[in-house]
């Protein structure tokens, strides 16, 4: 399966328009034409997560929290985000994040939490542009 097919499946379940205005969900780094050799799921992208993906031979990391929230004028390795960006690119690892779009999706994170604590008649009251 190509990485772009994984991305399409994720976005069918949790469409990007469901993300809050502050968010940066979606494709973070990489090209999606390659065949997926494996996917590592995580809450946050860290160097340890990328090291594990490299050790396993996986070329896709799917995180809940986006690695990149702000624009960068240069990538020089001055912080952990830049280190992760450089490591992912150097090792041909695609990073995809499903954050508030997954939280807000019907059947997504918030709905699963409601289900686990026994709530019924759950619906999304509003979407936020905050």
Predicted regions and their residues:
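Active-site loop-to-helix "anion-binding N-cap" substructures in soluble metabolic enzymes
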Residues: 3-17, 21-24, 28-60, 67-122
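Conserved small/polar residues in nucleotide/adenosyl-binding loops
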Residues: 126-130
């Amino acid at each position: 399966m190509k990485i772009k097919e994984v991305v399409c499946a994720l976005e069918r379940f949790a469409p990007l328009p469901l993300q809050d205005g502050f968010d940066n969900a979606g494709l973070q780094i990489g090209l999606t034409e390659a065949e997926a050799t494996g996917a590592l799921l995580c809450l946050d992208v860290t160097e340890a997560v990328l090291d594990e993906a490299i050790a396993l031979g996986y070329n896709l990391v799917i995180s809940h929290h986006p690695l990149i929230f702000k624009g960068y004028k240069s990538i020089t390795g001055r912080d952990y985000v830049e280190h992760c960006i450089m490591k992912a690119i150097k090792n041909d690892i695609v990073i995809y994040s499903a954050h508030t779009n997954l939280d807000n999706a019907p059947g997504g994170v918030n709905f699963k939490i409601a289900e686990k604590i026994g709530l019924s008649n759950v619906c999304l009251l509003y979407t936020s542009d905050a």
